[in-house]
Design a protein with these regions (language model features):
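Rhodanese-like catalytic fold shared by cysteine-dependent sulfurtransferases
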Residues: 1-24, 28-66, 71-143, 148-153, ...
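Segments forming glycine/polar-rich beta-alpha architectures that bind adenosine-containing cofactors
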Residues: 157
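Intrinsically disordered cytosolic tails
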Residues: 162-164
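C-terminal catalytic/acceptor-binding lobe
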Residues: 186-190
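Short, well-ordered alpha-helical segments
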Residues: 224-229
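Terminal low-complexity "docking" segments
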Residues: 241-244
Length: 278
């Protein structure tokens, strides 16, 4: 196994964020540096750089990993090398060039630590989230954002409406998109907006997606041209899949595609000029 620590730029990593192509991000700053900062890179979880053997076995199989420290110096490089020499043969790992400071300078999104219990998640203890069964829009959009920006290992539970709060307490799960909880509708805004607000995620593409979600979820398709289409696709997925988790799996692709379109393809047009005769 190659023992050389390989770097990835903040710009490259930003381009991967918000999709299934994104690597697993591990914050390996020294504990004092981690505790002194109020944010982590979006989707990152903290792991002790001096106890790699304690958490290595809990990493998911066959997923690329990026580790970062403050400036991309010895802490992240040493951790990266340790992962690459783990003997598993499956840990393709890189370190973030310039660390979290380079990420912030490049405008990469971060999330506020402690905006919800158990975030960032601990070793072998992913956050759990619970909401009403038979999701349509917000209850698919929120899990997408949680997996892509907050906790990539998060687990989701769908329950009958009258059981959500009881089961949330029983299973130490975070309730969302139900009345009277932290992550729910606020005025004319939906639960997706509440997550962005409370985790203080500063990402223009995510803000644009939030407008589309809000229009589809609150019956205001005039908010964004894509809202009506998202509503149609969401209702179609609900009609196709009786299993809520299967619908979530399919819905993740929808939001990956919408987010990618916002980031990279909004200016692209499609017409029939190719078929017109000269």
């Amino acid at each position: 196994m190659d023992t050389i620590a390989l770097g990835i730029s903040a710009t490259k990593l930003i381009s991967l964020l918000g999709s299934k192509r994104a690597p697993l991000l591990l914050d390996v700053r020294r504990a004092a540096a981690f505790d002194a900062d109020s944010v982590v890179i979006a989707s990152a979880t903290w792991r002790d750089p001096f106890a790699v053997d304690d958490w290595l076995k809990f990493l998911p199989h066959h997923r690329e990993i990026v580790v970062y420290c403050v400036h991309g110096h010895e802490i992240s490089k040493n951790t990266c090398s340790a992962l690459r020499t783990s003997g598993s043969g499956r840990l393709i790992s890189h370190f973030l060039e310039g660390g979290i400071e380079a990420w912030k300078a490049a405008g990469g999104p971060t999330i506020k630590k402690g905006a919800a219990p158990g975030i960032p998640s601990a070793v072998n203890n992913p956050s759990k989230w619970i909401t009403r069964e038979r999701p349509k829009i917000d209850r698919i959009a929120c899990p997408w954002m949680i997996r892509r920006f907050i906790d990539p290992m998060a687990e989701f539970i769908y329950a009958p409406s009258d059981q959500v709060l009881v089961r949330a307490q029983q299973q130490s799960a975070i309730p969302y998109d139900v009345p009277g909880v932290q992550f729910s509708h606020r005025g004319d805004r939906c639960s997706f907006d509440a997550l962005i607000e409370d985790f203080q995620i500063n990402d223009p593409a995510l803000d644009a997606l939030a407008l589309i979600v809000r229009g589809a979820d609150t019956g205001k398709p005039q908010l964004a041209a894509q809202s009506a289409g998202l509503l149609a696709i969401s209702l179609g997925l609900s009609a196709l899949y009786a299993d809520d988790h299967q619908m979530l799996d399919e819905g993740m692709n929808v939001y990956d595609a919408l987010y990618a379109w916002i980031k990279t393809a909004r200016a692209e047009v499609h017409n029939a000029d190719f078929f017109k005769q000269p």
